[in-house]
Amino acid sequence: MQTDSTQAAHELGDASFYLHDYHFRQDNHNGICTLQPQSRQGYGNVYQVQPADGLFLSTGNWIPYASMERKYEINQKLVKIYYLESGSVTLIQNGRKAQTITEGIHLYLNKPSQGRVLYQPNIPISYASVLLFEDYIEKNLQDRFTPDDFDYAEVYDWKAFDYNTPEVGTLFLQIRDKLIAGETSRLYYESKVGELLSIVAGNFHKQRQQIASKQQNLSKSEEKVLESVRQAIEQNVLNPPEVSQLCKIAAMGQTKLRESFKSIY
């Protein structure tokens, strides 16, 4: 069973769940896989493209009519970066405490592992996703670029403020719109994946340098309130709270908040 689910995920990407677990209707046209729930299950569409072996980009906008559960057990390493625009989604992984997936950009690392994803009924699920299996990463990224450009090992150290940014959110919206429009260019999608990883890796290196050099200038209490500000921003990076609200969270004036926040983030 484990081998079957792993193979299905590698061959079909996220579509394996929709096809095998819930038997969504499928239509393949010019390299774009379109999936639709059965009429009794929900309403909407999921689009997926596979530019290369081990690489999948997808977007979905659909409404489940009843609670849905996705069980997975994947015996391969993979990296998934996705932007959840809306939806009530819960992740339960390897017996850990249930985690509610908030709106924004998220990183999922399979090392390998198993778990469940729960979807609540009658709440629109809107997302865009990039899924990379380890064989794609090694062949197309790790073997072609130096660690200064992309270091696979560093992915496991990425933090939310490296990838949950407006720039990354905008990139996912571009991918979403191209998929819906029927774009099939392998060059386009692989270049977008490269751009995505380059942005996040660049943010990671920048943040690491800044934290090392400037964190010593802030007190522990200031670091704590700035972390609260960062979390408030990450709740919706494309429409963050007003500066006045952030000042209240930090109990700082605008100038001090701006300078202190920039010093570590």
Pin down the residues of each PLM region.
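Helix-turn-helix/winged-helix DNA-binding modules
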Residues: 52, 181, 238-239
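Short Lys/Arg-enriched alpha/beta "domain-start" segment
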Residues: 1-29
